[in-house]
Amino acid sequence: MRLLIAAVGKAKAGPEQDLFRQYCRRLSPPPVLKEVEEKRPLAGPQLKAREAELLLATLPEGAKVVALDEKGRDIGSVDFAHRLRDWRDSGCQDVAFLIGGADGHGDAVRERADLLLSFGRMTWPHMLVRALLAEQLWRAHSILTGHPYHRP
């Protein structure tokens, strides 16, 4: 199953980017990262709608979509791994994870998402969310393959 991470904004060099890459390299094949950015000076609802368009344009046809959202479901690592396993076992070829901009996701992303996922009620910096997601993808892989990285 191929994994795509589509994110608003360009990653800057730093420890968050290093951590993201470290976890992605552990996965085979590693997730593909697509970064989108709106250059025009839009604000509020217009910006969210435009960022949603840009994110949705990155999706492979038929992909399952997970939107990272502070109002999403807060699930454990094992449940997350099982969700990915179930999609894989049902023949899903692509899963796309969408990370919105500073104002969150536009309605179009929320409507398209198969899962709205939260990493808790706290607000996280977008670059750190990438690293958290990559770690959880590695952890899910570890859970599903019996690798000792994840200890229940």
Swiss-Prot record:
> What would you give as a GO molecular function for this chain, any one?
rRNA (pseudouridine-N3-)-methyltransferase activity
Q: Which PANTHER family match?
A: METHYLTRANSFERASE (PTHR33603), RIBOSOMAL RNA LARGE SUBUNIT METHYLTRANSFERASE H (PTHR33603:SF1)
Assembly, per entry = Homodimer.
- Swiss-Prot/TrEMBL keywords: Cytoplasm, Methyltransferase, rRNA processing, S-adenosyl-L-methionine, Transferase
**Entry-linked Pfam families:** SPOUT_MTase
Q: What is the lineage of its organism?
A: Bacteria, Pseudomonadati, Pseudomonadota, Alphaproteobacteria, Rhodospirillales
Q: List the record's Gene Ontology CC terms alphabetically.
A: cytoplasm
The organism's place on the tree of life at top rank: Bacteria
Name the record gives this protein: Ribosomal RNA large subunit methyltransferase H
In terms of InterPro entries, this protein maps to: Alpha/beta_knot_MTases, RlmH-like, tRNA_m1G_MTases_N
Q: Briefly, what is this protein's role?
A: Specifically methylates the pseudouridine at position 1915 (m3Psi1915) in 23S rRNA.
Binding positions for S-adenosyl-L-methionine?
Answer: 68, 100, 119-124
Q: Does the keyword Phosphoprotein apply?
A: no
Major enzyme class: transferase
Q: Please report which protein family the annotation says this sequence is part of.
A: Belongs to the RNA methyltransferase RlmH family.
**CDD domains, from UniProt?**
RlmH-like
Q: Which reaction does it catalyse?
A: pseudouridine(1915) in 23S rRNA + S-adenosyl-L-methionine = N(3)-methylpseudouridine(1915) in 23S rRNA + S-adenosyl-L-homocysteine + H(+)
Which Enzyme Commission number(s) are listed? 2.1.1.177
Q: What is its main location?
A: cytoplasm
Subcellular localization is given as: Cytoplasm
